[in-house]
Amino acid sequence: MTIQARHPHLLRLTDPPVILGHRCTSCSRVAFPPDPYGCEQCGSSCEDLEELDLEARGTVHAVATVHRHHRPYPTTPFTVAVIELSGGPVIKAIVTGSQVGVGAEVEGVLVQDLEDTEGNTLVDLQFQVVQ
């Protein structure tokens, strides 16, 4: 049994974790998640996109607490934030801790998710407020 990323094409299991995005070589736009079709900004083809490691750190721009969810995991309530990553793109992610608010600096942490059908432990990325 091994530990694997729940979404291996989006996340590298390092310490600290690395988010896998891309940069357009034509216009320098940085994006996450990687777009297999090309650049949304300038229209360049996917051949003009290069893989880019993004630091799992950023600033919270909006926060919401989810009290009802259509899946059993994650258990409710949980907090979701809109985070501008230090590398540029904006993502939505679960944030833990009681001091989550607009303007908070957050960093990514790997958390155990579920097990797959083969008994491998899956981990996912969440964020926590930087102390």
Predicted segments with their positions:
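A broadly conserved sequence feature marking short terminus-proximal activation segments
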Residues: 1-19, 101, 124-131
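Cys/His-rich short segments
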Residues: 15-57
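Conserved hydrophobic positions within beta-strands
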Residues: 58-60, 95
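Short, conserved beta-turn/loop elements at beta-strand boundaries and strand-helix junctions
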Residues: 64-69
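Short, basic/aromatic beta-hairpin or loop at an interaction surface
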Residues: 75-90
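Short alpha-helix capping/helix-loop boundary micro-motifs
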Residues: 90-96
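Short nucleic-acid-contacting surface segments enriched for D/E, G, S/T with interspersed K/R
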Residues: 96-108
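OB-fold/S1-family single-stranded nucleic acid-binding modules
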Residues: 111-131
